C-alpha cells in the first residue's frame, strides 16, 4: 500500500484511488438515503432551472473541516455548481464567519445541503477535539493517532477529520 498525500496533506495508508472510491461511495449512499428519487417539496415548488446560492455560516468556534468533502458533494450532485471558499480545512473559525458560498440550481443546492452540513459538523467536531489533544501534548513525544474504531460507512471522512485536526 502507498502512503499518499490527499486533500490538504491528508495522509492515509491506502491508495489515492481507493480513498476516492470510499469518498464517492459515502456521497452516493448518503444522497440516496437522504433524497432517494428526489426532494419532492423542491421538485414541486422550485423550477428546474431556478438558480440560487447559499452560504455556510459558522455557529461556534473551532477547526473547520470538510470543505474539500463539501466541494465533492456539490460536484457529485451538479457538476456545474461553483463553490467560492474563504477558509481552508484546518483553519480556526469563529461564530459569524462565512466559510463558503455555493452557486448552482436551487434544487441541486437543496439536494446537497443536508449531507454537506451533517458531514462538516461531524468532521469539524472531530478536528476541533483532535486539535485540543494535539495542543495539550505539544512539547512531548506523544502523537495523536486515529484508530479503526470509527462509524461504519463513514470511516474515511472521520479519519480525514483527525488528520485535519492535527
Residue ranges and their predicted role:
Residues 1:
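Short polybasic linear motifs
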Residues 13-166:
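Acidic/glycine-rich phosphate/pyrophosphate-binding loops and surrounding catalytic core
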Amino acid at each position: 500500500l502507498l502512503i499518499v498525500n490527499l486533500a490538504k496533506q491528508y495522509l492515509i495508508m491506502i491508495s489515492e484511488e481507493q480513498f476516492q472510491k470510499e469518498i464517492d461511495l459515502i456521497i452516493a449512499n448518503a444522497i440516496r438515503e437522504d433524497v432517494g428519487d428526489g426532494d419532492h417539496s423542491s421538485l414541486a415548488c422550485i423550477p428546474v432551472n431556478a438558480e440560487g446560492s447559499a452560504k455556510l455560516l459558522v455557529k461556534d468556534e473551532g477547526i473547520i473541516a470538510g470543505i474539500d468533502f463539501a466541494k465533492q458533494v456539490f460536484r457529485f450532485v451538479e457538476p456545474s455548481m461553483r463553490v467560492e471558499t474563504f477558509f481552508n480545512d484546518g483553519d480556526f473559525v469563529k461564530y459569524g464567519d462565512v466559510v463558503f458560498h455555493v452557486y448552482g440550481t436551487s434544487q441541486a443546492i437543496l439536494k446537497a445541503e443536508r449531507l454537506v452540513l451533517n458531514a462538516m459538523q461531524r468532521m469539524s467536531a472531530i478536528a476541533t477535539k483532535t486539535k485540543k489533544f494535539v495542543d495539550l501534548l505539544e512539547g512531548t513525544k506523544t502523537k495523536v493517532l486515529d484508530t479503526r474504531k470509527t462509524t461504519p460507512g463513514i470511516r474515511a471522512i472521520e479519519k480525514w477529520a483527525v488528520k485535519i485536526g492535527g
